């Protein structure tokens, strides 16, 4: 080892060695990418997150977890199954990165698929997938290395090995993240047998159904619709031959869902439906569909308008909250839909105007005094302010945040989308009454998305405090506001 005495060095040499030492010290002390202060850019944000948001439990009031997998306390065989199976966010990114379909939904081996994902990850920088990927590795598996082709094998092996232990089964993951309530997405004809199994064998997280009756609206596909009505009739234990029969069957199932703990409905719609109609023509449209006759587009819209009102009336009778997810245009790639089916990454943002129909729909319910708690979600960011003002047109003082703008959804479930949603809600309503985040996910690994949202929320408020837009003297209230948005508001609002 060469030892140089300071007196033998020139000043420029000393400067050089000093800079080298600084660089070495910097590298040795460099925080991992996912660290305690990830996305928190000032002291106020850090205080709000670490003292308030970080400690709150989770209510995941809208997700697409499979109830059977929860009931069975499913154990995943490897990282590919738990991370890439059914995740159309990742599939879209892989396709965009030039990965052949055989490595995405095809028959290639598990590690081959994972390797292609690892090759894609560096190219997802500035896409939320980059943040989600590394948050999930850190929080779930304790892995702080960045995923790329050089680290793929080691990360795959380490995480897959951990998945073989009891601590990484589905129920254990939910307990680890202190998930108090999960609401799955369920059709009226579903038996809810796995919800009952979970209820009879509790593990610490309430797993409740959500009423999602979209299939009961699809009269434009009479052959499929007839089969669905048969399934619904069997579940309800009655014949369905008229529109009134349909409502009676749905009400029976609605009652059953309520008995099983359901307190939320959800509707995935291109737009609100609010056409004028007569009940005689709705019954005729329904009977014709059962005979295999395809309705006109005008008849489709009238039928949807009628049944959507009836769904909302049922929800009001039981005091449920109803959710409307507006603005998706689905299954746009016909060739790939024919191969892979729905929910495989071929949906997009629609641009249909929603203000007139939305106001007309909600006004009909308000005029009947049958407008229950309602959350409005838009997929097109142009509709943030539209739905925020729509919601506050129908609040009636009976419940804080009774009608409100929902969190950034699907393509807007990212930093910019969340900030724009919260800014619209803040500007045109009450952010403090917001029921907060949901995963909307099919994966047991998605709970760090609640952390992601909370960090964005705290940084948004922290920046306002730093810039003098919020009073520092009100820190106690702002801390409580963060706790409420993270958990308390949802607990009070949904009354699970």
Predicted regions and their residues:
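Short, positively charged and aromatic/hydrophobic N-terminal segments
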Residues: 1-10, 19-22
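Metal-cofactor-binding active-site regions of metalloenzymes
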Residues: 15-318, 370-372, 376-388, 392-496
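Metal/cofactor-centered catalytic core regions of large enzymes
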Residues: 299, 345-348
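C-terminal amphipathic alpha-helical interaction region
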Residues: 322-324
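Hard-cation-handling environments
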Residues: 328, 333
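Short glycine/proline- and charge-enriched loop/turn segments
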Residues: 337-345
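Divalent-cation-assisted or electrostatically stabilized phosphate/pyrophosphate-binding catalytic cores
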Residues: 351-358
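Short, basic/hydrophobic alpha-helical segments
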Residues: 361-367
């Amino acid at each position: 080892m060469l030892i140089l005495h300071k007196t033998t060095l020139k000043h420029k040499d000393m400067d050089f060695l000093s800079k080298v030492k600084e660089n070495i010290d910097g590298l040795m002390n460099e925080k991992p990418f996912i660290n305690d202060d990830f996305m928190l850019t000032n002291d106020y944000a850090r205080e709000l997150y670490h003292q308030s948001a970080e400690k709150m439990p989770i209510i995941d009031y809208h997700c697409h977890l499979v109830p059977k997998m929860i009931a069975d306390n499913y154990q995943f065989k490897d990282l590919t199954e738990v991370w890439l199976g059914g995740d159309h966010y990742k599939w879209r990114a892989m396709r965009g990165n030039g990965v052949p379909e055989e490595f995405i939904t095809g028959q290639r081996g598990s590690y081959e698929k994972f390797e292609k994902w690892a090759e894609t990850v560096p190219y997802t920088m500035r896409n939320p997938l980059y943040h989600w990927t590394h948050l999930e590795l850190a929080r779930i598996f304790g892995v702080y290395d960045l995923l790329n082709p050089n680290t793929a094998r080691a990360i795959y092996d380490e995480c897959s090995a951990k998945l073989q232990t009891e601590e990484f089964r589905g129920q254990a993951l939910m307990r680890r993240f202190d998930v108090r309530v999960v609401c799955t997405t369920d059709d009226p004809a579903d038996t809810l047998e796995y919800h009952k199994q979970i209820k009879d064998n509790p593990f610490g997280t309430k797993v409740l159904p959500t009423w999602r009756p979209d299939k009961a609206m699809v009269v434009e596909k009479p052959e499929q619709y007839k089969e669905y009505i048969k399934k619904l009739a069997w579940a309800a234990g009655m014949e369905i031959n008229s529109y009134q029969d349909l409502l009676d069957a749905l009400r029976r199932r609605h009652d059953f869902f309520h008995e099983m703990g359901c307190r939320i409905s959800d509707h995935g719609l291109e737009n609100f439906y609010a056409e004028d109609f007569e009940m005689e023509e709705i019954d005729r449209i329904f009977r014709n569909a059962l005979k295999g006759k395809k309705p006109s587009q005008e008849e489709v819209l009238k039928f949807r308008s009628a049944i959507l009102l009836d769904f909302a009336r049922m929800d009001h009778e039981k005091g449920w909250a109803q959710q409307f997810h507006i603005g998706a245009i689905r299954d746009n790639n016909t060739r790939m839909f024919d191969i892979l089916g729905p929910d495989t990454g071929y949906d997009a943002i629609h641009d249909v105007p929603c203000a007139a129909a939305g106001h007309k729909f909600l006004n009909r319910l308000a005029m009947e005094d049958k407008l229950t708690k309602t959350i409005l979600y838009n997929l097109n960011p142009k509709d943030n302010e539209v739905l925020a003002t729509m919601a506050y047109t129908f609040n009636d003082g009976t419940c804080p945040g009774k009608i409100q703008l929902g969190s950034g959804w699907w393509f807007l479930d990212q930093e910019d989308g969340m900030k724009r949603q919260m800014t619209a809600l803040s500007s045109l309503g009450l952010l403090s009454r917001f029921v907060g985040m949901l995963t909307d996910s099919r994966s047991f690994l998605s709970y760090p998305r609640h952390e992601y949202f909370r960090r964005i929320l705290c940084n948004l408020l922290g920046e306002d405090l730093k810039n003098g837009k919020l009073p520092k003297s009100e820190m106690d209230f702002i801390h409580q506001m963060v706790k409420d948005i993270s958990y308390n508001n949802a607990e009070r609002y949904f009354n699970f």
